[in-house]
Amino acid sequence: MKKNLKILVITGGVISGIGKGVTSASIARLFRYDFRVTPIKCDGYLNTDPGTINPVEHGEVFVLDDGGEVDMDFGHYERFLNLNAKSSWNITMGKIYKKILENERKGKYLGRTVQLIPHVTDEIKSTIFQIASSENSDMLIIEIGGTVGDMENILFIETVRQIRQEIGSGNISFIHLTYVPSPAGINEQKSKPTQQSVKTLNKAGIFPDLIIARSSQVLTDQIRKKVAMFCNVESTSIIDNVDVSTIYEIPISFYKQGVHEILSSKLNIKVDPKIEELSKLVGVIKSNFFVPKKIINIAICGKYAELDDSYASIRESLVHVAAHLDLLIKSTLIDSNDLNESCLKEFDGIIVPGGFGGKGYEGKIMAIKYARENNIPFLGICLGLQLAVIEFARNVCGILDADTEENLARDKPLKSPVIHLLPEQKGIKDKGATMRLGGYPVILKKNTIAFKLYGQDRIIERFRHRYEVNNDYIDLFAKNGLIVSGFSSDFKMAKLIEIPENKFFVACQFHPELITRIENPAKLFLGLIKACI
């Protein structure tokens, strides 16, 4: 680990879900050009990772190149920093306790009583410093999940307090993201929740150097002075984080408010954020948000419709495409359980994303059929590919009982498994981290839509699945107009399908939304929207 390692710690207060991940990524972006920045997310839940958590409860599961299933905030880290994160950077209390219990069984504590302090905090510290060492990091951005005062994150808070004592206060800075409400009918900002949140943090031995106020409007001078007085910070160290048309405005806003200068002064470093390229792209997004040159309406037909964060990366992919094509994309999440054709008539394109289980199958299949028959641009992702195959088998090839082995809701034995379990998955009982996960090569067939979009015959994409297209049916599909345009590197598994006769009917087994960048939008989303214009 470098002797001059710098650490920024981001905590949250008042309520959860106010954007710590975006805030952390935005601050990290200001330092990315001058420092080797490594983002770390600390989550207090006892799951080893979020891979088995319902997206409606915790947001989408983000899959990394190394196969790790991590918190959705890593999507923000990767997109803002243009890097490929590692699963070890997501520290969960489940991982920490598992390691401690394993060490205890191995006798590594030499008969001592294993306690929360020092053993748990020491293990967290060790993990953090190991990451810094292995990545040769100049700077760590440590986001502590949840809200200050939660029982789940107390030990993470204590750990970063101890780290300050070990590396010196000049090498670490604490940033607190809080919420300043303006209750309806009062029309006045309230600082008391922020004061209480900071006092809770103070009781744990942490005194923030920077307070970032999440609110609907810029803080009034009165509120700013009040927060400064009762939270022991300079008024210049209280930063506005107001509602914006796109999250990519936030690094620019922080830059204009001098966040990088405040933190650089505290840490005794110099930085040049180089914000120009991002500013140009954000300018395009903002101009189309207020006065759109063209509007494209996209339906996202998914089963996790209760929470927008379930499909966060898909929405971001569309934002990236919009910035490059100079237009506005309006995406609407439609519950696949309530789908009917009348719901889809107003849309220029349709996306059927991934998911698990049989719930909502038939609604998605109906949407796919509607897109195919009406030549509406369509993109299927993961399960979306599998259901596109089922729809084609049933309605074009005449295999009326075509289905997937995953659908356990059948009342009859499956005779035509056009989608079946991956051979490597047979016999696996555990659910966590047992799928085909991570980055794998895909070989593209020349003279196909996919090949034209990517401009090369070999790509790397990220996967998260247990089921695949049954090769026994591929020739039949091809005879009827659906071809395989992308294969696994051994040519044994179909990874991309398309219908050449349609304007854009493409489906992939991988998740292209996981590698999109605002500087370089995912190619399949780019192709989808171009077909909608």
Curated annotation (Swiss-Prot):
It comes from Borreliella burgdorferi (strain ATCC 35210 / DSM 4680 / CIP 102532 / B31). The lineage of its organism: Bacteria, Pseudomonadati, Spirochaetota, Spirochaetia, Spirochaetales. CTPSs have evolved a hybrid strategy for distinguishing between UTP and CTP. The overlapping regions of the product feedback inhibitory and substrate sites recognize a common feature in both compounds, the triphosphate moiety. To differentiate isosteric substrate and product pyrimidine rings, an additional pocket far from the expected kinase/ligase catalytic site, specifically recognizes the cytosine and ribose portions of the product inhibitor. UTP binds at S16, K190, S191, K192, P193, T194, Q195, K226. This is CTP synthase. The keyword Nucleotide-binding applies. The gene is pyrG. Keywords: ATP-binding, Glutamine amidotransferase, Ligase, Magnesium, Metal-binding, Nucleotide-binding, Pyrimidine biosynthesis. Catalyzes the ATP-dependent amination of UTP to CTP with either L-glutamine or ammonia as the source of nitrogen. Regulates intracellular CTP levels through interactions with the four ribonucleotide triphosphates. Residues 304-533 form the Glutamine amidotransferase type-1 domain.
